[in-house]
């Protein structure tokens, strides 16, 4: 199946379909400044998507689905289904998850500018009205513009053992790896049907994954297994 140690990299494109707002924090803002700026790469100043945002959202969505399947409500991450903890980790068991979500960088800046984009973000004005006093509260929300494409990268580590078991000196079976990739594909599909970032119930944060492909980045992987893993990803 594999060598004694392996890392499988999943790459693809994450496309923003509706304005994306992943905030850079609630620090001090000068009068007239945007209330909620987006997070940016500190060097290029281009918009980025933190791996923490992707990991947290996918884990939450998968936990809900596993809970619905087993009629269980998981109140805390450490109470998640064993399969979820195997992929994302368990702090109480001191177990690192098999998945590593990378920060994603904008890749089509030149294309967006060629298509007429003056800036890579937009400022959307929103107004909350107090029902009692009718007082307005105008807010400025910075959003990554639709059509922005980001280089998606996720690393799956072939590791040992599962939550609640002793760490065994044996690699997971091919069936277990395929099961994990099925869960990864379902998590990404659930994200497409949900939203990333804030204000998703108001239309923000719809995204789409494309060109997903798995490859053996470290170690050897049987060709037939790799084909099956890519078949799972094709379902997204």
From Swiss-Prot:
One of its GO terms (biological process) is defense response to virus. Pfam families: RAMPs (PF03787). One of its GO terms (molecular function) is endonuclease activity. The keyword Lipid metabolism does not apply. CDD domains: Csm3_III-A. Keywords: Antiviral defense, Endonuclease, Hydrolase, Nuclease, RNA-binding. Disruption phenotype: Deletion of the entire CRISPR-Cas locus (cas6 to cas2, Rv2824c to Rv2816c) decreases resistance to plasmids encoding spacer elements about 6-fold. It is an enzyme of class 3 (hydrolase). It comes from the Bacteria. Its EC number is 3.1.-.-. Encoded in a type III-A CRISPR locus. CRISPR (clustered regularly interspaced short palindromic repeat) is an adaptive immune system that provides protection against mobile genetic elements (viruses, transposable elements and conjugative plasmids). CRISPR clusters contain spacers, sequences complementary to antecedent mobile elements, and target invading nucleic acids. CRISPR clusters are transcribed and processed into CRISPR RNA (crRNA). This subunit has the target ssRNA endonuclease activity; it cleaves multiple sites in the target RNA at 6 nucleotide intervals. Belongs to the CRISPR-associated Csm3 family. Part of the Csm effector complex that includes Cas10, Csm2, Csm3, Csm4 and Csm5. This is CRISPR system Cms endoribonuclease Csm3. It comes from Mycobacterium tuberculosis (strain ATCC 25618 / H37Rv). The lineage of its organism: Bacteria, Bacillati, Actinomycetota, Actinomycetes, Mycobacteriales.
């Amino acid at each position: 199946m594999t060598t004694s140690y392996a890392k499988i990299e999943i790459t693809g494109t994450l496309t923003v379909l509706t304005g994306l707002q992943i905030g850079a924090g609630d620090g001090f803002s000068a009068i007239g400044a945007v209330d909620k700026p987006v997070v940016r790469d500190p060097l290029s100043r281009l918009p980025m998507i933190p791996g923490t945002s992707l990991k947290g959202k996918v884990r939450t969505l998968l936990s809900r689905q596993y809970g619905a399947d087993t009629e269980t409500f998981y109140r805390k991450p450490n109470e998640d289904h064993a399969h979820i903890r195997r992929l994302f980790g368990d702090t109480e068991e001191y177990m690192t998850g098999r998945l590593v979500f990378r920060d994603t960088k904008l890749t089509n800046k030149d294309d967006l500018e060629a298509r007429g984009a003056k800036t890579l973000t937009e400022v959307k004005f929103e107004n909350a009205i107090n029902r009692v006093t009718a007082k307005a509260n105008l807010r400025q929300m910075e959003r990554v513009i639709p059509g922005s494409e980001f280089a998606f990268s996720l690393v799956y580590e072939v590791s040992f053992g599962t939550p609640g078991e002793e760490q065994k000196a044996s690699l997971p079976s091919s069936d277990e790896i395929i099961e994990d990739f099925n869960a990864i594909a379902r998590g990404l599909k659930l994200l497409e049907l949900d939203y990333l970032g804030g204000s998703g119930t108001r239309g923000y944060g719809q995204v789409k994954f494309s060109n997903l492909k798995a490859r053996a980045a470290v170690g050897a992987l049987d060709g037939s297994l790799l084909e099956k893993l890519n078949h799972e990803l094709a379902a997204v």
